[in-house]
């Protein structure tokens, strides 16, 4: 144990880990942008800018913040909830009578509600927008973990939400309940729309904390409350929680799991596992760059890995985050990553840039620490950070306990 006054209750191991993170925090790999609090989700907002230059993040401090990648300009919404935001979804609509655009940003929250931020523009979605509403509606009996926007066969846009309460629920974009689905699972981790399903029979897939992946066909909006939605047989490619689902351009499914693997599930082979990518810790997210044939994964060990999509071989590891990586998204040739360290970083997969990164990784002298990025944004209080970490560790401990139970 350390005998220094402020560190009396910390072990030598924890002190060494804190010192390691403090040293690593000074690096500028990935051109980091520091946010107010830990980041739990990220996504590209094509309604704001069709070029993909604007991403939004969901923060543990209760804020939704937009970032223009080309300028690092921030567009923060007013802080709504006093609890962490876990997930994002976007919806946009144009007025049939004028050039105005209405955009809604939805955020799932630990306060069991869905927060809605409505923005209005008369100059098109790539121009500046004015926030006209910040509100929420009660959605679940536990944390809201994931959101998706879907269009029903009768051409109505709806919100689908999943929660640790194990329910999938359906809402109008104005927050009116349309119905719910109660699969036999512990919690819902991720919701995605099958891009190869038809508009007349849209298919929704979702993953669970129990290991199962399910699919169902979305009925007309007026029939959701009365329809008996038929779930597919479960896809069981993993040993425990499946955190993320991602469809590549071929319509195959990629998964990220707490069993320390990412997997490629083949559509043409009944969603059987085509490839398994092993990791040293929980895999939090997965995405693909189909043009260049890469699979990108985010791991709890702070690293972003780039894999050869065809061979499954590890090609490169991007290092920069100094806490767990929580989310990924792709825009053009850029991989965007976010982390518990409250930074957003970007990594280029353009062939010349990726080759340069590989060469740097082979020469440690080229990766010496650089000046700490500027940070003039306030952070969570120590009390808030401790609470967030305790909740996340509790969730992870629960996962490990359930894994042990499943193995018995």
Predicted regions and their residues:
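Terminal intrinsically disordered, low-complexity extensions flanking WD-repeat/beta-propeller proteins
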Residues: 2-26, 313-317, 322-326, 331-334, ...
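Short C-terminal beta-strands that terminate individual repeats in beta-propeller domains
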Residues: 29-34, 74-80, 126-128, 133-139, ...
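Beta-strand-rich domains and repeat architectures in extracellular enzymes and scaffolds
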Residues: 31-62
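Canonical WD40 repeat/beta-propeller blade segments in eukaryotic WD-repeat proteins
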Residues: 36-47, 82-97, 141-151, 185-197, ...
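Short coil/turn segments that connect the beta-strands within blades of beta-propeller domains
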Residues: 51-53, 93-95, 102-103, 156-157, ...
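Conserved beta-strand element within WD40/beta-propeller blades
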Residues: 55-59, 105-109, 159-163, 204-208, ...
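Short coil/turn segments within WD40 beta-propeller repeats
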Residues: 61-65, 110-115, 142, 165-169, ...
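Short loop/turn segments that connect beta-strands within beta-propeller blades
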Residues: 69-71, 119-122, 172-176, 219-221, ...
């Amino acid at each position: 144990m350390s005998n220094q006054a402020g560190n009396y209750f910390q072990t030598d191991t924890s002190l060494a880990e804190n010192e390691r993170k403090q040293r690593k925090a000074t690096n500028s790999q990935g051109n980091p942008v520091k946010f107010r609090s830990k980041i739990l989700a990220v996504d590209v907002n094509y309604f704001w800018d069709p070029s993909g230059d604007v991403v939004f993040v969901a923060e543990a401090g209760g804020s939704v913040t937009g970032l223009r990648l080309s300028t690092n300009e921030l567009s923060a919404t007013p802080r709504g909830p006093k609890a962490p935001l876990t997930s994002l979804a976007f919806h946009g609509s144009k007025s049939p009578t004028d050039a105005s655009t209405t955009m809604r940003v939805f955020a799932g929250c630990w306060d069991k509600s869905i927060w809605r931020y409505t923005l209005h523009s008369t100059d098109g979605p790539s121009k500046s927008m004015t926030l006209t509403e910040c509100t929420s509606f009660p959605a679940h009996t536990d944390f809201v973990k994931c959101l998706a926007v879907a269009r029903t066969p009768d051409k109505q846009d709806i919100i689908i939400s999943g929660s640790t309460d194990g329910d999938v629920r359906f809402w109008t974009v104005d927050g009116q309940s349309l119905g719910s689905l109660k699969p036999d699972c512990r919690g819902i981790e991720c919701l995605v729309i099958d891009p190869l399903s038809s508009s007349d029979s849209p298919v929704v897939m979702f993953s669970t904390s129990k290991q199962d992946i399910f699919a169902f066909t979305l009925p007309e909006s007026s029939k959701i409350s009365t329809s008996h939605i038929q779930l597919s047989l479960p896809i069981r490619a993993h040993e425990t929680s499946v955190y993320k689902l991602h469809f590549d351009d071929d319509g195959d499914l990629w998964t990220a799991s707490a069993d320390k693997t990412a997997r490629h599930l083949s559509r043409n082979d009944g969603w059987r596992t085509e490839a398994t990518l092993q990791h040293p810790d929980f895999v939090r997210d997965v995405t693909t760059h189909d043009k260049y044939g890469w699979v990108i994964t985010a791991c709890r060990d702070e690293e972003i890995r780039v894999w050869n999509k065809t061979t499954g071989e590890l090609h490169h590891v991007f290092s920069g985050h100094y806490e767990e990586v929580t989310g990924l998204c792709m825009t053009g040739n850029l991989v965007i990553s976010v982390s518990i360290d409250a930074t957003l970083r970007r990594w280029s997969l353009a062939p010349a840039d990726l080759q340069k990164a590989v060469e740097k990784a082979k020469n440690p002298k080229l990766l010496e620490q650089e000046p700490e990025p500027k940070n003039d944004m306030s952070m969570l209080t120590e009390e808030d950070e401790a609470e967030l970490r305790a909740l996340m560790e509790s969730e992870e401990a629960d996962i490990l306990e359930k894994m042990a139970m499943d193995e018995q």
